[in-house]
Amino acid sequence: MKLLLPLLLLLCLELTLVCIHAEESSSMERNFNVEQISGYWFSIAEASYEREKIEEHGSMRAFVENITVLENSLVFKFHLIVNEECTEMTAIGEQTEKAGIYYMNYDGFNTFSILKTDYDNYIMIHLINKKDGKTFQLMELYGREPDLSLDIKEKFAKLCEEHGIIRENIIDLTNVNRCLEARE
């Protein structure tokens, strides 16, 4: 009987933590205001279990500059490095039937969602790419400033791990050429 009480208390604590985590996730979806993500952003980090996609010269290595919110879509202005030159590109994410889920065609068919944001500092995006019968996932961390605190980067790393991406596959983009000189 003495052993049962501590086990019950531990179980209650675990259930409380699970409920708090679930509430945090669902309140992000429930209270998400897409208009507030509009504006200038900087690419801080990318992660994928297919690391070559986000390494230098990788097809998914892109540097965001701006997100514009339209009625049923998000317009991303970003830069790629092509032949050692910064090249501006625009991609449009169209809203799906499911709230908060968007799709776009870029290097395959992509669906993406915004997992976490505080609107003023950071945004964390989860993307699933399908091309030629293969699927991979990509996580992106954007900041309103050229760099973010270690706390936010750690939050991103934990979110990547929750999605099966190991820390070694997170690339910090703050120390690479992000085409900042190409920004208007």
UniProtKB/Swiss-Prot annotation:
Main location: secreted
Transmembrane annotation, as ranges: none
One GO cellular component term: extracellular space
Modification comment: Glycosylated.
Signal found in the keyword field: yes
Cellular localisation: Secreted
Keywords: Disulfide bond, Glycoprotein, Pheromone-binding, Secreted, Signal, Transport
Signal peptide positions on this chain: 1-22
Classification via SUPFAM superfamilies: Lipocalins (SSF50814)
PANTHER family hit by this protein: LIPOCALIN, MAJOR URINARY PROTEIN 1-RELATED
Family: Belongs to the calycin superfamily. Lipocalin family.
Protein name as catalogued: Major urinary protein 3
Species of the source: Mus musculus
Gene expressing this chain: Mup3
